[in-house]
Amino acid sequence: MDLTGLLLDEEGTFSLAGFQDFTFLPGHQKLSARIRRRLYYGWDWEADCSLEELSSPVADIAVELLQKAAPSPIRRLQKKYVAHVSREACISPCAMMLALVYIERLRHRNPDYLQHVSSSDLFLISMMVASKYLYDEGEEEEVFNDEWGAAGGVAVPTLNALERGFLSAMDWHLYTDPREIFEVLSWLESCVAEQQGRRRGWYTYTDLCVLLEQPTWQLALGSLCQRLVKLSCLLAVAYVSSVALAVASVAVIHQSLGLSCTPTPGPPDLGLTSRCLLEPCIPSVPQCLPSPANVSSCLEGSTGLRSLWGSLLASLTPPPLPPPDPPAPPTPFHNCHLCQKLQRDSPTCHACHHPNRTAPTALSSPWYHTYGLAPPWPWSPVPASIPQPQQCSLFSIMELARLKSFIFPG
């Protein structure tokens, strides 16, 4: 059996049955899927006319483009007319893109023709010529001029005259390279994605993929990424610099405090602390710290003194005392060497007859030792002749409480 027997049917004629579903182009299914997804045609595979009429976003783009190309106010193109013609004449998206190629050629080659034709007639005749170019005679998709006239509401003689004028303006140059079709398809996809995203207020992943394929969007995104990277680098440098400056400041302050308040080698000077605490009671003790600020700075510099101060201040809360006697009128202290010599023997000086208010009266109960005067060690600067301190006056207790609240506020 030869090839002729395979192609001819029983009646001896060549039948095209079964060839309509045959895919000649390898990328036909891929192109159809791309058009359905990016031009908002949907995925209704069971519908026969899913790709035989323009989608709503594509119709909007066609109306906007043709109104700008043919600005004549006569028979101005409307979306309702586009939808009706595309549904009645079964306009495919490929015919729509080819018609856009023809209109772009007219804008460059014969712009005077576009000034005299209406936008509705331009849409109808461009779609008809594009469909005739794509679907040759004998195809099922073939639509005659009378059907086009009925779909567009134009008489057949008028439609024939419009077709001859369009072909003359095109100089019968209808051939189109496939690359031009794909360029128009890419432009149409970007217009549809941008328009629909602005209308909704947000973009789908498909819209973003379409927009990022455009050179202008790639340049804009690249410049935005560069600015974000520069801003991130500046913020990182500023953060690292601030952290380094803070660490350096803390180190310098710690070192300066450590150098200014580092105690000398040797046993701790417990007598100095005792003398500072009991200064209101024992005015004859020399070399007391001048202010609580110096005491607090030394506490931060020495760990041993901090622990000592903690133990001392923990024991500074005495038991409740009986109500004190009415205070006597203050008597100025006299710088009498006999008072300083005899303050441990008698509260009254026999030479100047002035009372010594800070001298201890007698040894009392053991809880008076909580005021922290250490025993006279051999290396202590406190003289061994000074006995353990006794209960101080109300003025000294107030001073100690004020010192405690200053060192540990709250």
UniProtKB/Swiss-Prot annotation:
Pfam families: Cyclin (PF08613)
Any one of the GO CC terms: cyclin-dependent protein kinase holoenzyme complex
Sequence intervals crossing the membrane: 233-253
Subcellular location(s) per record: Membrane
Topology class, membrane: Single-pass membrane protein
GO molecular function, one term: protein kinase binding
Residues of the signal peptide: none
Annotated InterPro entries: Cyclin_PHO80-like (IPR013922)
Entry keyword set: Membrane, Transmembrane, Transmembrane helix
Family as reported in the entry's similarity comment: Belongs to the CNPPD1 family.
Protein name per UniProt: Protein CNPPD1
Source organism phylogeny: Eukaryota, Metazoa, Chordata, Craniata, Vertebrata
Gene name linked to the record: CNPPD1
